């Protein structure tokens, strides 16, 4: 591993992000420290703050990479599933599969809390916005008359519900035996929601 004068600031940022991502993947967010990141890249802990404001900023960028990875897993699904219900089910299943395959990276998205003095940057909000746009696409096919505000609320409502099932299922808090049953609960949720949307149930905005 090179020393400080061997890497530019951008290169140092990339090294830190990659190392932090690997630590979170293997040990979870609770296992991440600045000292571990520094050790992994061969620098002193203080050098990290040449590239980042603090450890929270490093985590934010790792979580951004996770959102980008998840987006790549789902972005093509609506175009491959002409039936909007099938598309919604496939999106939910892809989300659950990602959580199963990358549990620590996935949990980090929701476990990490920024300090009050550090608002979410625009680039991170843009990553979440495009995720919800993918979810909204089949819902807008089901109910074309939705306003943009209704579409946003509908996609967030469905995705939040799917996340709840995934989270409780992976933590074994649903009192169900195996992953197949988690998929069954997920399917029941999505089908019920989509049918309600198709039936014209009111969307509060």
Cite the ranges covered by each PLM segment.
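Amphipathic C-terminal alpha-helical segment
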Residues: 158-177, 192-203
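An amphipathic alpha-helix adjacent to DNA-recognition modules
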Residues: 10-18, 25, 30, 51-75, ...
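Short hydrophobic/aromatic patch on the recognition helix
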Residues: 41-52
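Ser/Thr-centered, proline-biased regulatory motifs
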Residues: 30-36
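Amphipathic alpha-helical segments used for helix-helix packing
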Residues: 101-119, 136, 167-175
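N-terminal intrinsically disordered/low-complexity leader segments
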Residues: 1-11, 81, 201-205
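Hydrophobic alpha-helical connector segments
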Residues: 75-104, 145-148, 154-158
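Amphipathic alpha-helical packing segments from all-alpha helical-bundle domains
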Residues: 118-144, 152-157, 184-195
């Amino acid at each position: 591993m090179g020393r400080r004068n061997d890497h530019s600031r951008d290169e140092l940022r990339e090294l830190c992000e990659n190392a932090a991502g690997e630590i979170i993947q293997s040990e979870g967010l609770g296992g991440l420290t600045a000292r571990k990141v520094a050790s992994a890249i061969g620098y002193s802990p203080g050098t990290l703050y040449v590239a980042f404001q603090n450890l929270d900023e490093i985590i934010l960028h790792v979580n951004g990479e996770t959102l980008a990875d998840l987006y790549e897993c789902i972005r093509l699904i609506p175009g491959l599933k002409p039936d909007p219900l099938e598309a919604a089910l496939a999106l939910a299943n892809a989300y659950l599969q990602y959580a199963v395959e990358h549990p620590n990276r996935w949990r980090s998205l929701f476990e990490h809390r920024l300090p009050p003095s550090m608002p979410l940057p625009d680039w991170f909000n843009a990553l979440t916005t495009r995720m919800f746009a993918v979810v909204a696409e089949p819902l807008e096919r089901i109910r074309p008359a939705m306003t943009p505000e209704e579409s946003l609320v509908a996609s967030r409502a469905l995705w939040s519900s799917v996340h709840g099932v995934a989270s409780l299922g992976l933590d074994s808090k649903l009192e169900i035996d195996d992953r197949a049953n988690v998929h069954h609960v997920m399917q029941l949720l999505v089908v019920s929601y989509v049918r309600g949307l198709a039936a014209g149930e009111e969307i509060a905005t």
